């Protein structure tokens, strides 16, 4: 099958968040299975060119219709860790992708409307006719709209679109100007409720809504998040639209890269280990204590790795630190905050706890240290208020670090409570789950984990090993997406 992925990110060359990892990981898995996979990306001035091999001009004269005229673009081709990537560079005074950033500009709606138009125009003019076009997030939400309303009348009538939503909070809001620019000329038609009109602002267009309405299949990043998006405010106003299109909407759990996150081969940890020689994990625990100057004591280490913000349940992260200490555990935090108030709070906590030999707060992000924490900690807490998929708990499971999570989003699909899960036998359970976003619920889950560590160390080790047996690689998501591709290829 010939598949083209169109996105605003692809790790490691363009990475602002988890989207880039997903686009790369899924593309690689699909290619390993014998499919032809190509990626189309913006050519940002600030992307990591050192990760692109053999970058060269592949298409010199791409003219993209825009506001009734046309913008000249050059399309470059290169290989990103074996993946064929095309990078679109427009030559105009707008300098759409020469801003020193990926996102955050006042005209982001127009920047990515242009990118979507240019990607389709490139496929059209170069005579590329993929079986599947897979688009990601609001930045490419207009692609299925333009494919159906414009390009299907120009020889692109057999292409099918899968549209994946990674983050409902950012939906891409434009206006009449978007229609004029892209050639979607029937203003009254597109401003209907069942087309692109935003559900909050009747004078605005919603790119993500367009992607949902016009795509052949719509996915999000976990089955439980798909339900949340339809029936709760997690959909950020798109719940009704998703419900109307529920026959083509599903959740597919993301995967993690086991070539990078794997204690058996991890080059960032002093001692590699597996479920068969789990005792080697203790050497990493010792190394973690030495590096972070924690006291050598017969205590469990509880970790938190991630952003420090409201989405991640920052109030519960703070409480987890002190509750761990009160329960005779050690605590390690590796996190960063963009909000000034949260950042100042944790800097104060770091100073206050500086002399405590059972806690270390590392503010910022350190890739190498994160690997050592996963390998050295006994438990990892993920108290998110909102978690579409979640990678932290998957990585923790692979490293035999028992997750303590709040039951939201993808956390529900990956962590199964040792004591209370009624759907799985005890040998399939792998962690601890709490549901309310309050201190008492968190404490209850932490207490159960810490008590098991102290009172039944063999059972705790068995729980950790059970978690290591789960496969959260890209293998299963790859199969699910290929099934979706086959379904839309032959159904529509």
From Swiss-Prot:
GO MF assignments: alpha-1,4-glucan glucosyltransferase (ADP-glucose donor) activity; alpha-1,4-glucan glucosyltransferase (UDP-glucose donor) activity
Protein known as: Probable glycogen synthase 2
Top-rank lineage group of the source organism: Bacteria
Key words of the record: Glycogen biosynthesis, Glycosyltransferase, Transferase
PANTHER family: GLYCOGEN SYNTHASE 2-RELATED, PTHR46083
NCBIfam families reported in the protein's UniProt record: glgA, PRK00654.2-1, PRK00654.2-4
Phylogenetic classification of the source organism: Bacteria, Bacillati, Cyanobacteriota, Cyanophyceae, Nostocales
Binding site for ADP-alpha-D-glucose: 15
Native source species: Nostoc sp. (strain PCC 7120 / SAG 25.82 / UTEX 2576)
Chemical reaction(s) catalysed: [(1->4)-alpha-D-glucosyl](n) + ADP-alpha-D-glucose = [(1->4)-alpha-D-glucosyl](n+1) + ADP + H(+)
Its biological purpose: Synthesizes alpha-1,4-glucan chains using ADP-glucose.
């Amino acid at each position: 099958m010939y598949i083209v992925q169109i996105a605003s990110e692809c790790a490691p060359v363009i990475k602002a968040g988890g989207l880039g990892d997903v686009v790369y990981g899924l593309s690689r898995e699909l290619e390993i299975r014998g499919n032809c996979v190509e990626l189309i990306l913006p050519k940002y001035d600030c992307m990591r060119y050192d990760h692109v091999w053999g970058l060269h001009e592949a298409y010199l004269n791409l003219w993209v219709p825009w506001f009734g005229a046309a913008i000249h673009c050059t399309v470059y081709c290169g290989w990103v860790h074996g993946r064929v990537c095309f990078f679109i560079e427009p030559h105009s005074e707008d300098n759409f992708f020469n801003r020193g950033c990926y996102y955050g500009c006042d005209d982001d709606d127009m920047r990515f409307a242009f990118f979507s138009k240019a990607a389709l125009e490139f496929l059209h003019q170069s005579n590329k006719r993929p079986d599947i076009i897979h688009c990601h997030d609001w930045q490419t939400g207009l692609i299925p709209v333009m494919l159906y309303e414009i390009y299907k009348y120009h020889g692109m009538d057999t292409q099918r679109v899968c549209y994946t939503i990674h983050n409902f909070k950012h939906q891409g809001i434009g206006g009449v100007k978007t229609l004029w620019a892209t050639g979607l000329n029937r203003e009254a038609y597109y401003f209907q409720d069942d087309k692109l009109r935003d559900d909050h602002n009747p004078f605005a267009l919603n790119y993500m809504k367009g992607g949902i309405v016009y795509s052949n299949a719509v996915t999000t990043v976990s089955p439980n998040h798909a339900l949340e998006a339809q029936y709760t405010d997690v959909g950020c106003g798109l719940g009704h639209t998703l419900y109307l299109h529920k026959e083509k909407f599903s959740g597919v759990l993301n995967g993690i890269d086991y070539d990078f996150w794997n204690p058996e081969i991890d080059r960032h940890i002093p001692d590699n280990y597996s479920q068969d020689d789990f005792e080697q994990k203790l050497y990493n625990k010792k190394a973690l204590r030495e590096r972070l100057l924690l006291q050598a004591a017969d205590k469990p280490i509880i970790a938190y790795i991630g952003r420090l913000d409201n989405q991640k349940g920052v109030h519960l992260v703070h409480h987890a630190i002190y509750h761990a200490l009160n329960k005779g555990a050690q605590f390690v935090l590796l996190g960063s905050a963009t909000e000034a108030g949260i950042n100042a709070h944790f800097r104060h906590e770091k100073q206050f706890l500086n002399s405590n030999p059972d806690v270390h707060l590392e503010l910022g992000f350190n890739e190498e240290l994160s690997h050592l924490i996963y390998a050295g900690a006994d438990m990892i807490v993920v108290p998110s208020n909102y978690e579409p998929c979640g990678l932290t708990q998957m990585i923790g499971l692979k490293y035999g670090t028992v997750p303590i999570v709040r039951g939201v989003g993808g956390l529900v699909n990956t962590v199964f409570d040792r004591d209370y899960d009624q759907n799985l036998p005890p040998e399939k359970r792998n962690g601890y789950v709490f549901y309310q976003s309050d201190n008492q619920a968190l404490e209850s889950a932490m207490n159960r984990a810490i008590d098991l560590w102290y009172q039944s160390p063999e059972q705790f080790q068995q729980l950790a090993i059970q978690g290591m047996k789960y496969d959260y690689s890209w293998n299963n998501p790859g199969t699910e997406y290929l099934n979706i591709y086959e379904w839309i290829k032959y159904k529509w």
